């Protein structure tokens, strides 16, 4: 993208790719996937958005974190962001998250998912998401934030899982992909107030193909 792209103007919300809601006669429950680097405020946005949608809130760290910590101890790793640990656990962690989402969707409940969604930013990864959430109309929300603000947020929240990132900010930032997803998505500036971000997502979902709170 060039510097003139509206997605890169402060305060801008940008929709990349075509909107593909379900046909009006077959409304689907929304499945909102909130992705972005650590520190962009994914969990904060999800916690504010889920009640507005009457949605189940599914967080990758909450759903799979305790088991990941056990595996880390068994394999002698203390850094949860260790690449070798990620290689062991990423596939089953995301499979668990998507399976929980699919169960809720089959029960008629919208879902809001929280995870970095790095592989899911690619056409191949997104195809896996849409296949597993076939009962839904998945929407990828990508939160972006300037590098210095990312580091400041991580230092402020001081979460155990961020210890490795905080100890070596330069190394952490080298792993952050600044490019937007290569699939249709809603790009949001994470520096904006949470209420404004929620409003942007709700506006994006205001299509006849989405069923929210039991209403088409």
Task: Please provide the spans of the model-predicted regions.
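Glycine-rich phosphate-binding loop used to anchor ATP phosphates in small-molecule kinases
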Residues: 88-134
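Conserved phosphate-donor/acceptor-positioning beta-strand/loop module used by diverse small-molecule
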Residues: 133-154, 188
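P-loop (Walker A) phosphate-binding loop of NTP-binding proteins
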Residues: 37
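Walker A/P-loop
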Residues: 43
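Conserved substrate/cofactor phosphate-moiety recognition/catalytic segment
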Residues: 47-102
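Small-molecule kinase domains that catalyze NTP-dependent phosphoryl transfer to phosphate-bearing small molecules
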Residues: 156-200, 213-216
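Hydrophobic anchor at the beta1->P-loop junction of P-loop NTPases
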Residues: 34
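ATP-binding Walker
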Residues: 40
């Amino acid at each position: 993208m060039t510097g003139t792209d509206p997605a890169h103007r402060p305060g801008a919300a940008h929709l990349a790719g075509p909107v593909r809601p379900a046909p009006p006669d077959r409304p689907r429950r929304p499945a909102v996937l909130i992705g972005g680097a650590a520190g962009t405020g994914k969990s904060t946005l999800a916690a504010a958005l889920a009640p507005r949608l009457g949605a189940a809130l599914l967080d990758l760290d909450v759903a799979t974190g305790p088991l990941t910590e056990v595996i880390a101890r068994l394999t002698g790793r203390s850094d949860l962001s260790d690449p070798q640990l990620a290689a062991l656990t990423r596939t089953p962690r995301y499979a668990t998250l998507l399976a929980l989402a699919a169960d809720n969707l089959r029960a008629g409940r919208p879902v809001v998912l929280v995870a970095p969604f790095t592989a899911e930013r690619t056409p191949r990864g997104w195809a896996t998401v849409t296949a597993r959430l076939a009962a839904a109309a998945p929407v990828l929300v990508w939160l972006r934030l300037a590098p210095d603000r990312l580091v400041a947020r991580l230092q402020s929240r001081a979460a155990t899982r961020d210890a490795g990132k905080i100890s070596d900010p330069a190394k952490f930032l080298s792993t952050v992909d600044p490019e937007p997803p290569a699939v249709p998505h809603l790009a949001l500036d994470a520096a904006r107030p949470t209420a404004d971000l929620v409003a942007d997502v709700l506006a994006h979902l205001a299509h006849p193909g989405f069923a929210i709170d039991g209403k088409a």
